[in-house]
UniProtKB/Swiss-Prot annotation:
The gene is hisI. Transmembrane segments: none annotated. This is Histidine biosynthesis bifunctional protein HisIE. Keywords: Amino-acid biosynthesis, ATP-binding, Cytoplasm, Histidine biosynthesis, Hydrolase, Multifunctional enzyme, Nucleotide-binding. It holds the Pfam family PRA-PH. GO terms for biological process: L-histidine biosynthetic process. Gene3D superfamilies: MazG-like (1.10.287.1080), Phosphoribosyl-AMP cyclohydrolase (3.10.20.810). Its EC number is 3.5.4.19, 3.6.1.31.
Length: 231
């Protein structure tokens, strides 16, 4: 597969569009971008690595969620400027919990009614991105000077320190709810979300995995869900 790497004109192309297809089902899973370094990692490890344009860094697919992609074959197009990764997908490819990122279908047949463009999604994309971005910022703060970063100092305190703050923030939210103070409720809830994310980062658990657990519970009564924990 190293021949693929050498055929790309990296001086001309900084990023190569990379289509990801599941080997067994032949389903298109996602579209990502490969840089010279990410493709090199992909070819060396046989695990899919990509370059994130939003975060400006290389990331391994499934590095936090565990939904990794084992590369079985790489295809290069006739112009040497786009790739296809043929993979074995562990879990799902899409952060919404769908198997593929391409789960919205719009028919060109006039006799078929298209779903509305603003169709509801499993997770509101904007909200998810805020949680995901904040989580990765927290991860980046881990190695900073604890005298200059509150997040770094909190992570340095470990589970006891973080747990104490989560309990404290949850209590403040409860008081705001009791006082029916809408502004305070929103403010304290944001504080609680942040400290929960710090706790998740301590254990390297992404918000995606929590959202997947919430999705699993959808359509199931709370009584049934609690009863299932006893087995």
């Amino acid at each position: 597969m190293q021949d693929v790497f050498r055929q790309i004109d990296w001086e001309r192309y900084e990023l190569i569009p990379t289509i990801v297809q599941e080997k067994q089902s032949q389903q298109i899973l996602m579209l990502a971008y490969s840089s010279k370094q990410s493709l090199e990692l992909s070819l060396q490890t046989h695990l899919a690595h990509y370059f994130s344009r939003s975060k400006q860094r290389i990331w391994q697919k499934g590095e936090q969620s565990g939904h990794i992609q084992h590369i079985k074959e790489v295809k290069l197009d006739c112009d040497n400027d786009s790739l296809i990764f043929i993979v074995e997908q562990v879990g799902v490819a899409c952060h919404t919990g769908e198997k593929s990122c391409f789960f919205r279908i719009f028919s060109l047949d006039k006799n078929c009614q298209n779903p509305p463009v603003s169709m509801p999604q499993k997770y509101p994309i904007g909200v998810y991105h805020i949680l995901d971005d904040l989580y990765h910022i927290i991860e980046q703060r881990r190695c900073e000077n604890i005298e200059h970063s509150y997040t770094a100092s909190l992570l340095a305190k470990g589970v006891n320190g973080i747990g104490k703050k989560i309990i404290e923030e949850a209590g403040e939210l409860c008081f705001a709810l009791k006082d029916k103070d809408e502004k305070a409720i929103i403010y304290e809830c944001a504080d609680l979300f942040y400290h929960i994310l710090v706790g998740l980062a301590l254990e390297h658990i992404t918000p995606e995995r929590v959202l997947q657990e919430l999705r699993r519970r959808m359509g199931q009564s709370g009584i049934e869900e609690k009863a299932s924990r006893k087995h």
